[in-house]
Amino acid sequence: MRRMIWIAAVAAVAVAAGLAGCGSREGADMDGIAEDIEARLAAYAETEIAANLDVLPASEREALDRMVEAAEAMHDAFVRQALPMADEIRAALDEASGPRTDSARAYFEINAGPWDRRFHHEPFFGDWEHPEGANFYPLDLSEAELASLEAGENGTNGLYSMIRRDASGALTAVPYSEFFADEYARAIAAMETAADATANESLRAFLTARIEAFRTDEFFASDMLWMDLDGLIEVVLGPIETYEDGLFGYKAAFEAFVCVADPEESARLAKFKGELPWLEANLPIPDEDKNPNRGSDSPIRVVDVAFTAGDTRTGIQTIAFNLPNDEKVREAKGSKKVLLRNIMNAKFEQILTPIAETLLVADQLGSLTAESFFLHTLWHEMSHGLGPGRIVKDGRDTEVRLELKDIYSSIEEAKADAMGPWCIFKLQEKGYFPDSIREQQAVTYLAGLFRSVRFGIAEAHGQANAIQFNYLLDKGVIEVEEGRFRIDVEAFPLAIEGLVHEILVLQADGNYGAGMAMIERYGGMSDVLAAALESLEGVTVDILPRYAVAD
């Protein structure tokens, strides 16, 4: 069953292969570079991203600069995770020549390899097949070894290890602290200098604990301290998300965010975190499936990004995150929602607004608002902290992530996306928002579906948005009028609650089969969706950030 999702995705991508002139390998030149490489590269708009560093005292500016250095080490570690056969591939790219070579090299940097992340990792340079497990696992796994890995035998399903062969040829888990010793040494040296420089006690405590985590592969203590950061600098450094492991979803990929916080805007949103227990109690699932044990601290931070690296810097740029992922931390302290304001603003202006003007019916365009985009992003991240996390399946304690394996990321992103407006509508009933939020949220949400599905349905967020679009189209909530789209504002709240219910139930049950069935039914590139995306040929797919702090 695990392989079926990839077969379906390949077929679906083929339907959408002509989008923006991209996605077809026909006619590669003699150096193996896709003929449409310039169009693929042009889909990403170079955008300068800057944070106001003038608000930082000298001590914190020094700390931030050193954390940028640590972030660069995380990027190098991530590329090692993402790129198998690195020496062979890089040598071939270095030797390539021709009019499209520079574009291929630039696109290689965007994708951390020769595979296009928008189009199910199809090669845009050479003909190497992308391994589902990236470089986390050996490339020559037997069926018996795959079964052993899937079962997590001998600790091979740990988040913080690379799977390699020992001298006898047997599979062994190599801890990140050993495998990435060089990158860790660079990051630790930079974090030590940052910890000495900062005047903020919470940042110093976190960095000190993070250094120890890098040395021991034990991240719980530093994740707990990360929840308490209260200064002007917000930072994420280390192995975090598991999207890159497309084989099992076990392995954490390296990434980094170095940001400057806005305390006043963060305080404005703090009122919402007190509603999380009430929202959990009102989720549309049986009480026994709810998770009242997740912590409710859940700080909200509004920040401007100064620098990113690793997993988050590759391909599509994120606009917010909700961390940590460790369910033990979530039960003790909740999770932190971090909104990347300058990234969000750039995407609203350059991408979401042109998409809406191209695809939505004219009489609903006035309901597209930056505030609704911001609120949906906030409640998407809040929703990651709601619903089943640690569950009991067949009498054993486990986690939703472990039971859903390779499809977890797509299902979880669909849950958070759909639950975002559900939460907003519930809070509107309590008086937090005016009645107008219903149409504004529905219209902005619809435009957002088109924005995110353009990332490609092989990517978790893109596939999650395909699920939502096709589900709502099937329910008659999304209507097509002469090539443009309308959302039924009155029917939307009930339909979105139905989708939230279906996802939460399969998560509570740890039901891989039900999750796969949802993806197979709704997660493909339907004809209606493919035609809509084709009409967006002239609209930027995503930004390509150029960080001022790096200049």
Enumerate the predicted regions with their spans.
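An active-site-proximal "capping" alpha-helix that borders the catalytic cofactor pocket
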Residues: 200, 409-426
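Active-site recognition of the HExxH zinc-binding catalytic motif
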Residues: 375-389, 416, 421
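Extended, compositionally biased alpha-helical segments that mediate assembly or anchoring
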Residues: 504-551
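Long, well-structured alpha-helical subdomains associated
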Residues: 421-517
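C-terminal motif of bacterial Sec signal peptides marking the signal peptidase cleavage site
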Residues: 18-21
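N-terminal helix-rich structural modules
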Residues: 29-206
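Contiguous, non-catalytic segments that form substrate-binding/exosite surfaces or channel walls
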Residues: 176-365, 369
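Post-HEXXH active-site segment of zinc metalloproteases
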Residues: 388-414
